[in-house]
């Protein structure tokens, strides 16, 4: 279980309120697929993934990225119950989609990079540490069914 301090929760929620989920989600998922191309195997029905520009411009990738990042909104609202919050998604990704649990960690790191790139100086070391803790907790919760 991940424990968040009041300061960490405040840093996470303060930044989250400013996140454009559609934009950041599309960028995060797109970057994941570009930097870690083996993750594309789960998105073969999403159309053209032949190049970085095709991936970043793909409307299905953008839509799914938004959906993925919206689930992080659930984490922001329930930081003390990440395992419960992601129990059904963990089951889906483990039993039906057969996603490598390491991919959750990779996506979390990409999300942190996208947020840092967007928010610049506002993404202080303290904010980065809080968000890194959050994405690590979410990755662990999503991988729970695998254990």
Swiss-Prot record:
Heterotetramer of two alpha chains and two gamma chains in fetal hemoglobin (Hb F). Gene3D superfamilies: Globins (1.10.490.10). PROSITE patterns: GLOBIN (PS01033). The gene is HBG. Residues 3-147 form the Globin domain. Pfam families: Globin. Heme b binds at residues 64, 93. It comes from the Eukaryota. This is Hemoglobin subunit gamma. One of its GO terms (biological process) is hydrogen peroxide catabolic process. Belongs to the globin family. GO terms for molecular function: haptoglobin binding; heme binding; hemoglobin alpha binding; metal ion binding; organic acid binding; oxygen binding; oxygen carrier activity; peroxidase activity. The keyword Iron applies. Gamma chains make up the fetal hemoglobin F, in combination with alpha chains. GO terms for cellular component: blood microparticle; haptoglobin-hemoglobin complex; hemoglobin complex. It comes from Dugong dugon (Dugong). Red blood cells. Keywords: Heme, Iron, Metal-binding, Oxygen transport, Transport. InterPro entries: Globin (IPR000971), Globin-like_sf (IPR009050), Globin/Proto (IPR012292), Hemoglobin_b (IPR002337), Hemoglobin_oxygen_transport (IPR050056).
């Amino acid at each position: 279980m991940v424990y968040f301090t009041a300061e960490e929760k405040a840093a996470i929620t303060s930044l989250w309120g400013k996140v454009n989920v559609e934009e950041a989600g599309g960028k995060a998922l797109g970057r994941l697929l570009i930097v870690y191309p083996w993750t594309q195997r789960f998105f073969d029905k999403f159309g053209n993934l032949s190049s970085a520009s095709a991936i970043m411009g793909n409307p299905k990738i953008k839509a799914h990225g938004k959906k993925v990042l919206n689930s992080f909104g659930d984490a922001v609202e329930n930081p003390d119950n990440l395992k419960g919050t992601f129990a059904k998604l963990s089951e889906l990704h483990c039993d039906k989609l057969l996603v490598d649990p390491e991919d959750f960690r990779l996506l979390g790191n990409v999300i942190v990079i996208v947020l840092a790139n967007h928010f610049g100086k506002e993404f202080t070391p303290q904010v980065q540490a809080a968000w890194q803790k959050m994405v690590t907790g979410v990755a662990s919760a999503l991988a729970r069914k695998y254990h």
